[in-house]
């Protein structure tokens, strides 16, 4: 399988413009023979949408953006795109979700189960999902997780308190998957890239699965996202690394030699 990790620089609130940006990246990936394209978390609406989520017409705008992608990609490769959708609960909130766009239609694959709390609390704006989803494609079972849901269940890197009372990553593994698809928006800080690579490599090797992680790039308010999307084989060996602080379409061929492993920036030895 050839998976394209679409390392996007999307604009918060510009749903129509973001849909066009994503579409251009998908077309570039399709020209390279991609079987599946994946965006970062919340790529359609832009990361950290905050109060936009409370606007009455925002949800409708996101639905229109998804339909635009579906209409434009009727003959294109399947696309997993991050976007807010209606919650499964009658709360009036939206859920942070992974959406499959394929053959002129779109459907929800997974709603984010684990949410952050505190100052940047996602729980203020989003309803959590019930469980992570699995996408069956070309003989593969792909478990889909959103950002912090990739945290290891064995506490090898940090302890994560799942507010939902269950561990989404471990439940996916127990259901049987061939690969983990990780849609992320991880802000840059000193050492974060090295830690991410160590943790995701550990997850791939521990559960003997391929792992594909696509990260946001660009800036939003005080946050900067460094991209450097990643792919690992089932031994935890790195197959590909995306560009740092730049948009990228990172194609990973699981049947071949993997993909391009871009170096970490020399000026950021701890990045």
PLM regions with names:
Residues 1-271:
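Enzyme catalytic cores with a strong preference for nitrogen-chemistry domains
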């Amino acid at each position: 399988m050839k998976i394209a990790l679409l390392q996007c620089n999307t604009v918060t609130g510009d749903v129509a413009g973001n849909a066009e940006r994503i579409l251009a990246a998908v077309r570039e990936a399709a020209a390279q023979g991609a079987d599946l394209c994946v965006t970062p978390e919340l790529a359609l609406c832009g990361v950290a949408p905050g109060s936009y989520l409370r606007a009455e017409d925002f949800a409708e705008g996101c639905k229109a953006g998804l339909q635009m992608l579906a209409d434009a990609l009727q003959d294109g490769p399947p696309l997993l795109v991050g976007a807010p959708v209606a919650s499964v609960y009658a709360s009036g909130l939206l859920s942070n979700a992974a959406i499959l766009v394929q053959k002129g239609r779109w459907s929800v694959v997974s709603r984010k189960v684990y949410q952050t709390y505190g100052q940047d609390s996602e729980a203020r704006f989003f309803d959590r999902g019930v469980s992570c989803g699995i996408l069956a494609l070309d003989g593969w079972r792909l478990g889909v997780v959103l950002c912090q849901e990739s945290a290891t269940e064995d506490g090898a890197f940090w302890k994560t308190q799942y507010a939902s009372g269950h561990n989404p990553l471990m439940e996916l593994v127990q259901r049987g998957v061939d690969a983990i698809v990780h849609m992320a928006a991880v802000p840059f800080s000193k050492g974060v890239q090295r830690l991410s690579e160590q943790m995701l490599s550990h997850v791939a090797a521990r559960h003997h699965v391929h792992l594909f992680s696509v990260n946001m790039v660009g800036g939003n308010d005080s946050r900067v996202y460094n991209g450097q999307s990643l792919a690992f084989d089932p031994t935890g060996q790195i197959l590909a690394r995306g560009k740092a602080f730049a948009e990228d379409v990172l194609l990973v061929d699981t049947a071949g030699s993997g993909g391009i492993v871009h170096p970490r920036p020399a000026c950021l030895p701890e990045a």
